Regions:
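Short, charged, surface-exposed secondary-structure boundary motifs
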Residues: 81-84, 177-181, 302-307, 347
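Divalent metal-binding segments
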Residues: 1-164, 170-175, 200-248, 310, ...
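Hydrophobic faces of well-ordered beta-strands that scaffold small-molecule active sites
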Residues: 9-11, 145-146, 166-172, 189-195, ...
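Residues that form or flank phosphate/diphosphate-binding pockets in enzymes
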Residues: 57-59, 280, 345
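Non-cysteine beta-strand/loop elements that form the S-adenosyl-L-methionine
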Residues: 14, 186-203, 290-300, 339
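A short helix-to-beta-strand connector/capping loop
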Residues: 69, 164-166, 184-186, 265-267, ...
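Extended hydrophobic/aromatic segments used for targeting, binding, or gating
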Residues: 158-192, 277-287
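His/Asp/Glu-enriched, well-ordered alpha-helical/loop segment
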Residues: 230-240, 247-249, 253-269, 274, ...
Length: 405
């Protein structure tokens, strides 16, 4: 079946970071043996930044890292990285704190924004890379995006001074927001917090148990998070919080309830990912007027992570039918969808929405399109091929794109 949808807005991406990564090697689509052969053939005289590493496909032992050329290998989830032994001296000269703390997973999960800044600095970002990345999204069905963690002030300046500014909404970490002048603060939609890790790095704040290694990791103690919300509630801006596991979701809701009761005010409040939200938490979020910003493409975690998640967690992932049918969240109003760039485009998200691992994860195409919303600053149409036999959706074409005046 072929159908046409509008060019869409991705409500959760990391545009400047992925633009910087465009000059880096990407092994996300490589078979493990091919990826390892590629890594072994990289230059010995400089540090190679490699993205798209999937630890469940290509585990990295200390012996393997000791034999590789100078590389930093960044997890596909963006949470977690490893550095080869020969790469450590290169990292020490450029980002010494990241180098010294590289093996401390708790520190890494608590410092995602500065690590993103380090990645951006290592890979390099300029207007050309930014434009090329955003243009590459058009044939994939995406015309605009929320940039969910602008890594540096310099990156904000590159984005906001580009012709693509009207197609981007900016979110920044609290520490970066406080460094900004009034003019730059006026450019951003709000502050973005990270409350837990990720399934890909075995650090999402789920109660568990995990299969094999895994630990619920929190960025903030409860009192520290509440203090941040109290302070941020006077900024007059929006609030977004990454919370994957049910324990992180609970921490977020409890802190927001107290902060709002005490007078904190935000233009909007978003919880990102919320893959393991339960019905009671969903009702509390609804009562607070919170927007759930979710990733239909993460439905495939229920297939990809059978090595670390129990059957109950595989099934609980992305409970869209409960959220929509039981609690009353409405795609496009208080439920938004985005890709997190994992992968880019609408095809994979549509595949997971229409052909999920569990019926509780299913979204209709109308719900998916509403949750993404139409592109900002640009318009066009996207032709989708929906193959019910192969259970796959692909983009077969896009119309001529028209830029907004």
């Amino acid at each position: 079946m072929t159908t046409t949808i509008p060019l869409l807005h991705d409500n959760h991406n990391h545009v400047s970071l992925y633009a910087a990564f465009s000059s880096c090697i990407d092994i996300s689509r490589s078979a493990p043996d091919a990826a390892l052969a590629l890594l072994r053939g990289l230059p010995e005289d400089r540090l190679s930044v490699v993205r798209g590493w999937k630890s469940f496909e290509l585990p990295m032992t200390s012996e393997e890292l000791s034999s590789l050329p100078p590389i930093i290998l960044i997890n596909f989830s963006l949470h977690g990285f490893v550095v080869s032994d020969s790469g450590v001296p290169f990292l020490e000269t450029t980002v010494p704190e990241v180098a010294s703390m590289r093996n401390d997973q708790a520190w890494c999960e608590a410092n995602v924004p500065p690590i993103f800044a380090a990645y951006c600095g290592l890979a390099g970002l300029d207007a050309k890379k930014l434009g090329e990345y955003i243009d590459r999204m058009l044939p994939l069905g995406i015309g605009s995006s929320d940039e969910m963690t602008v890594p540096t002030i310099q990156a904000l300046d590159v984005c906001s001074s580009s012709p693509y500014d009207k197609r981007l909404n900016y979110w920044v970490a609290p520490a970066l927001y406080e460094k900004m002048d009034i003019a730059r603060r006026g450019l951003v939609s709000g502050i973005k917090l990270f409350l837990d890790g990720a399934v890909g790095s075995r650090s999402a704040a789920i109660e568990g148990p995990w299969i094999g290694p895994g630990k619920a990791m929190f960025t903030y103690a409860d009192d520290v998070l509440l203090a941040i919300l109290r302070r941020a509630g006077a900024y007059g801006t929006g609030l977004s919080a990454h919370a994957i596991g049910e324990l992180a979701i609970e921490q977020a809701l409890s802190a927001i309830e107290v902060a709002v009761r005490e007078g904190a005010r935000f233009r909007t409040i978003r919880l990102e990912h919320v893959q393991y939200i339960d019905v009671n938490q969903a009702r509390r979020a609804k009562d607070l007027g919170i927007v759930l910003s979710m990733q239909p493409n993460f439905t495939s975690d229920s297939i990809d992570y059978t090595d670390r998640l129990t059957e109950s967690y595989l099934k609980r992932n992305n409970p869209f039918r409960m959220l929509i049918d039981e609690v009353g969240f409405e795609p496009g109003r208080d439920m938004l969808f985005g890709s997190d760039g994992m992968p880019d485009g609408i095809a994979y998200a549509a595949t997971q929405a229409l052909f999920p691992a569990y019926p509780s994860q299913r979204l209709s195409l109308d719900e998916l399109v509403a949750g993404y919303g139409t592109a900002k600053g640009v318009s066009g149409t996207v032709t989708l091929d929906i193959d019910d036999t192969e259970r796959r959706v692909s983009v077969s074409g896009t119309s001529p794109v028209r830029l907004a005046p």
